[in-house]
UniProtKB/Swiss-Prot annotation:
GO terms for molecular function: 4 iron, 4 sulfur cluster binding; coproporphyrinogen dehydrogenase activity; coproporphyrinogen oxidase activity; metal ion binding. [4Fe-4S] cluster binds at C61, C65, C68. This is Oxygen-independent coproporphyrinogen III oxidase. It comes from Aquifex aeolicus (strain VF5). Pfam families: HemN_C (PF06969), Radical_SAM (PF04055).
């Protein structure tokens, strides 16, 4: 894929916007939607008999990475995690009592923070506690995020014994200057060694996370990182655009702002990334993922079954996601719920015997329609009008008359093509896919101030 950008086009489309891991985005959640609504929606979800996906947030980290946009607790003092895990078990009890026992878990993810902040014993114990409360389906996808700097041989064994079958390693960039600037020093040799040990342990699916747009990155420097990553031969690669939002994440103010690549340079970097990974045999998935052709993600994209949730792209469209732990987000078919963000609030609520939800959102009919359109854009690189019309009983061109008018400019700029029965994302538009999705975002139209990362 070769995409040419002129400076005017970059200037025109480089604006803040959501990443659409949900629609509406989490910025629309309201504190009026709390525990009682969650309980009601959990009970109602049993009628759908949908399988479950579980997310567990392990918020602890040994040190802060300056690019990080996650909700983390920095602590060198081990022991802080024990009472937290016990409370997460209590939260599971509070939630699982409302769920039919025959609903199988087909996907589980531990994120953070740093899940391998936990000791080998804690990893095994905590997974046993989860299995006591939930029934797992055959061939469930069980994944964990790992920080290679702190990963021990004992942890690798414990993770394998606990039943994990997918690994995600945070690499970000292999350039020493960039690593120092973002406070995450991890030499290539270390990543290579951990990858080899994970392969020896029998893990068949390993994902590497990269970030472009970090201080001191150039197309030339990041090309070296990409070449080394290709040598490591991961099954999947996620290449995220750095979300620089110092107004939301104050620690990002410690990054040298003058060393951040321009929007133009970021696009040069990502064009190189796309070309390099495709030349190496990876399939370009959605907005920012790459996978081997036989990988489930690539198969799902070919079948039009890709979906997005708060962990990014997923092959499990028809599942309902339950989030456990501080700050985690659950996604039922018709509603979203988020737990308290601070440990103090989370602990206090669980200790009172309440589900620790502090805000959420219940979708209306317009939200359902727009979510399907936006997810099709983000996942399937286009929208078929007839599909949306059949699902919701609307006339697409009438319902979205204003949006189709707005899209004419994007069509002139070569981002999309509006055909008889569909909107098709063109190669250039793929790099600006969030901008295309934003046209269909009814909530964004009402927003004055945008606390989102920039689209480029």
């Amino acid at each position: 894929m070769k995409a040419e950008f002129d400076k005017e086009l970059i200037k025109k489309y480089d604006r803040p916007g959501p990443r659409y891991t949900s629609y509406p985005p989490a910025t629309e959640f309201t504190e009026e939607v709390k525990e009682d609504e969650y309980v009601k929606r959990l009970i109602k979800s049993n009628e759908r008999k949908t399988p479950l996906s579980l997310y567990f947030h392990i918020p602890f980290c040994e040190q802060r990475c300056l690019y990080c946009g996650c909700n983390v607790i920095i602590s060198h003092r081990k022991g802080i995690e024990e009472p937290y895990l016990e409370r997460v078990c209590r939260e599971m009890d509070l939630v699982s009592q409302y769920l039919d026992k025959d609903r199988k878990v087909i996907q589980l993810h531990w994120g953070g923070g740093t899940p391998n902040y936990l000791s080998p014993e804690q990893i095994k114990w905590f997974m046993e506690e989860i299995r006591k409360r939930f029934e797992f389906g055959d061939n469930a996808e069980i994944s964990i995020e790992l920080d290679p700097r702190y990963l021990t041989d004992e942890q690798i064994k414990a993770i394998k014994d606990a039943g994990f079958n997918r690994i995600s390693l945070g690499v970000q960039d292999l350039d020493p200057k960039v690593q120092q600037a973002v406070n995450r020093v991890q030499p290539y040799e270390l990543i290579k060694e951990k990858m080899e040990k994970l392969r020896e342990a029998g893990f068949e699916s390993i994902n590497l996370d990269l970030i472009y747009g970090l201080p001191y990155q150039t197309k030339e420097s990041f090309e070296k990182t990409v070449e080394k990553v290709i040598e490591l031969n991961p099954d999947r690669i996620a290449t995220y655009s750095f979300a620089y939002i110092p107004q939301v994440k104050p620690h990002q103010q410690l990054l040298p702002k003058e060393a951040l690549p321009s929007a133009e340079e970021k696009l040069r970097i990502f064009e190189m990334v796309i070309n390099k990974f495709q030349e190496a045999g990876y399939v370009y998935i959605g907005m920012d993922h790459f996978a081997k052709p036989e990988d489930e993600l690539a198969v799902a994209q070919r079948k039009g079954e890709l979906w997005r949730n708060f962990q990014g792209y997923t092959t499990k469209k028809g599942v309902e996601l339950l989030g456990f732990g501080a700050t985690s987000i659950g996604m039922l078919y018709d509603s979203y719920f988020q737990n308290w963000k601070t440990l103090r609030d989370y602990n206090k609520t669980v200790d009172e015997g309440k589900i620790p939800v502090f805000r959420g959102y219940v979708l209306n009919e317009d939200d359902f329609i727009r979510r399907e359109v936006i997810m099709d854009i983000m996942c399937n690189l286009g929208v078929e009008f007839s599909k949306i019309e059949n699902m919701f009983g609307i006339n697409f061109r009438e319902y979205f008359a204003k949006e189709l008018e707005e899209l004419k400019e994007m069509e002139e700029d070569g981002l999309i093509k509006v055909e008889e029965d569909r909107i098709k994302i063109m190669p250039v538009g793929r790099l600006l896919i969030r901008n295309v999705a934003m046209v269909f975002d009814a909530h964004l139209r009402r927003k004055k101030e945008l606390n989102f990362s920039r689209t480029i």
